Swiss-Prot record:
An example Gene Ontology biological process: DNA replication
DNA damage in keyword set: yes
Encoding gene, per UniProt annotation: recF
Pfam families registered for this protein in UniProt: SMC_N
Chief localisation class: cytoplasm
Protein's name in the database: DNA replication and repair protein RecF
Length: 397
């Protein structure tokens, strides 16, 4: 799969831009702040409906404009598909596929698949769990677009339930011995949260199982080290179980977590047991919003133990594993390879990792590279070149 045409209207710094692309390698070269990353960010947004740089959509709309539009022609197995996404800050996005509106935006997800490598990826290893949860969810949306709706529903219910918990404490104190209406309503929201949360947890755990062998293999490719990189899923619903619950082997617990019905029952049980603490603190203490992707290196936590170089190798392995999974899924389903985006990542790597990464990705169907100077693009990735300056994109090779 590759993107043959990209058009941006009021997206970031671009008021109106149309560029043609081709299979193979294309480097966007120019000083920082000139709009290189904005180009590849738009391609990434079409795949996941989220930016790898910011958590909200408001920053994507050019200053002074009401909305931004991203259009891309995607070629899969020689068949072009036009995808268009309209971004309006504070409102639901709207999408078109081949110029026809779709009833749900998520129907356009997964058409323009991509994997973005960026300097921010180091936070996948060294940062908070939120970034690792987002890594899993963004990949899930590309593999199974309907899960975008599940994630949105879970986030909506979580906000409602958390607001209810915050109000339940004062309501309980005012009511004395009586049960406030807020607590009776809480049972309903518990059910909604458990149902959506269980589906999300089960999907994440299956994804981790599929990613695991790819992460181990790609870490070895990038680092040439003997230390084994292994990922696993830490579920808050398991940690919330009573202390006297039987201890089970990891594989057994993981298998159970792939069954949404079992996860739903455990979430309901945990919420009932933790209700008093949740009301006191005004937060939801269990659910996929409190889970984590655990990264280990030679059986030690990568966060805190891995060196800077090892952390970079791990971050690259996670992205390369994502690419391998999307590629295999695309080949089976007729979608082809995802677009590979390397956003200013080579400037962050030592010479050995630069060479290894470049040699691994060079054969991909389409590779888009951004760099501040041409010297940052490895020789293995020689191809088309576009200079980016002041919001203008000029092809020079």
């Amino acid at each position: 799969m590759y993107v043959s045409d990209l058009a941006l209207t009021d997206f970031r710094s671009y008021a109106d831009l149309v560029i043609g692309l081709e299979p193979g390698i294309t480097a966007f070269v120019g000083p920082n702040g000139q709009g290189k990353t904005n180009l590849v960010e738009a391609i990434g947004y079409l795949g996941t409906f989220s930016s790898h740089r910011v958590s909200g959509d408001a920053a994507l709309v050019r200053w002074g404009a009401e909305r931004a539009v991203v259009r891309a022609k995607v070629v899969r197995r020689a068949r072009p598909t036009l995808v268009e996404l309209e971004i309006v800050a504070g409102r639901a996005n709207r999408a078109r596929v081949d110029r026809s509106p779709v009833s749900r935006v998520r129907e356009a997800a997964g058409i323009a698949r991509s994997v973005i490598f960026a300097p921010e990826d180091l936070a996948l290893v060294k940062g908070d769990p939120d970034g690792r949860r987002r890594f899993l969810d963004d990949l899930l949306v590309q593999l199974s677009p309907r899960l975008a709706g599940v994630r949105s529903e879970y986030e909506r219910v979580l906000r409602q339930r958390t607001a209810l918990l915050k109000s339940a404490g004062p309501a309980r104190r005012r009511s004395g011995d009586g049960e406030p209406a807020a607590l009776r309503t809480l049972d309903v929201w518990d059910g909604h949260l458990a149902r959506a949360g269980a589906e999300l947890v089960a999907a994440r755990v299956r994804l981790v199982q599929d990613l695991r062998p790819h992460v181990g293999a790609t870490y070895e490719q990038v680092s040439a080290a003997q230390s084994e990189a292994r990922i696993s899923y830490r579920a808050s619903v398991e940690e919330a179980r009573p202390d006297d619950a039987p201890t089970e082997v990891v594989e057994s617990v993981e298998t159970e977590l792939t069954r949404a019905d079992l996860v739903e029952a455990r979430l309901l049980e945990a919420m009932a047991r933790l209700r008093t603490r949740e009301i006191e603190r005004g937060v939801s203490l269990v659910g996929p919003h409190r889970d984590d992707l655990v990264l280990t290196l030679a059986d030690m936590p990568a966060k805190g133990y891995a060196s800077h170089g090892e952390s970079w190798s791990y971050a690259l392995a996670l992205r390369l594993a994502s690419y391998a999974l999307l590629r295999d899924d695309g080949e089976a389903g007729g979608g082809g390879e995802p677009v590979l985006v390397l956003d200013d990542v080579f400037a962050e790597l030592d010479a050995r990792r630069r060479t290894r990464l470049a040699s691994i990705v060079a054969s991909a169907e389409q590779v888009l590279v951004t760099a501040a100077v041409a010297e940052d693009v490895p020789e293995e990735l020689e191809g088309a070149r576009m200079d980016v300056m002041g919001g203008e994109v000029l092809r020079v090779r």
